[in-house]
Amino acid sequence: MSALTIFADNGASEPLWQSTDADAIREQLNAQGVRFERWQADRELGDNPTPETVLTAYQHAIDLLVAEKGYQSWDVISMRADNPQKEALRDKFLNEHTHGEDEVRFFVEGAGLFCLHIGDKVYQVLCEKNDLISVPAGTPHWFDMGSEPHFTAIRIFDNPEGWIANFTGSPIAEAYPRLA
């Protein structure tokens, strides 16, 4: 179940707000300029789908986003617990960073935790299958896939180069809860 927990950005001792209600989550995030929607990830992908399988199954969703915003490229990120690079990738994504473009993800399997540092708050968004999130360009954030990751998401980009991060150097991510 998708969830949103909001903390003050000076520590994670006590949540300021939390909910698993998709409408309430959308309302809170939309107020911050973050798009959050529940889409249908209902295509059969098999146990360990190839990127081509995922892209073919969800081309209709990609086409909608491209038509709406003019995105230029897309790919699939899929991570499983048996991936030998899981620790290195988790460490990389756990560092606060920004992008020069919106970060758009459509989760078609599993879950991951987006943590958005907006103003004086941290918004922890547990995204699961069926969730579409679009984090505005320039928003400091980090992503936790957990120690035993299991997710597949379609990534949509404004530029043909794909994922380009600008790390802030802030240690803020270390102060907030992570996925197990």
Curated annotation (Swiss-Prot):
Q: In which pathway does it act?
A: Amino-acid biosynthesis; L-methionine biosynthesis via salvage pathway; L-methionine from S-methyl-5-thio-alpha-D-ribose 1-phosphate: step 5/6
Q: Any signal peptide, and if so, which residues?
A: none
- Known EC number: 1.13.11.54, 1.13.11.53
Family matches, as Pfam families: ARD
Instruction: Name the keywords, alphabetized.
Output: Amino-acid biosynthesis, Dioxygenase, Iron, Metal-binding, Methionine biosynthesis, Nickel, Oxidoreductase
Marked site, May play a role in metal incorporation in vivo, at 96
Can you name this protein?
Acireductone dioxygenase
Q: Which GO terms describe its molecular function?
A: acireductone dioxygenase (Ni2+-requiring) activity; acireductone dioxygenase [iron(II)-requiring] activity; iron ion binding; nickel cation binding
Name the domain of life this protein comes from. Answer: Bacteria
Site feature: May play a role in transmitting local conformational changes: 102
